[in-house]
Amino acid sequence: IGSRGVCYAKRALEILDRWGVGDAVCSKGVSWNVGRTFFRDREVYNFNLVPEPDHHRPGMVNLQQYYLEEYLVARAAQRPGIELRWNNKVVSVTAADAAVTLTVETADGMYTVEADWLIAADGARSPIRRMLGLEVEGKIFMDRFLIADVVMKADFPAERWFWFDPPFHPDQSVLLHKQ
């Protein structure tokens, strides 16, 4: 199933609407608004992200990352001025006041590209940000997680459930999302 990116908030969905893929994401994904947090077997907190009446999207949508990537790649292929280059690896970045120069490695050799802008959208451990000496803004959690995608027949509601120290997995935490 694949749980890399899986949960997209309303604001992300609004941005995906601008790219023309919001409808595909919402129709394929699982929409949800309610989240519940438990300590052992007792619910200690809950929230409802129910959208305001004039909002077009739900609070959250769960969708496997590979579907979102598929929709974005298909949409990019339809847009003029966008060129996707597969199996190309940026190996160095030089930033100047007016431009940025990339050195790119391919199976056929190296080449350089100069651009006005560079967007480092290459993941949490971004080699591009590292080459530029940029830190990730925000919090980094060093905790280790086991993610398991399980196909099962169960009548769980489309909600986010999170347990601290659950009776079925003591001294740990568990997150349950419907996909």
Model regions and ranges:
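Conserved FAD-binding catalytic core of PHBH/FMO-like flavoproteins
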Residues: 43, 74, 117, 121-179
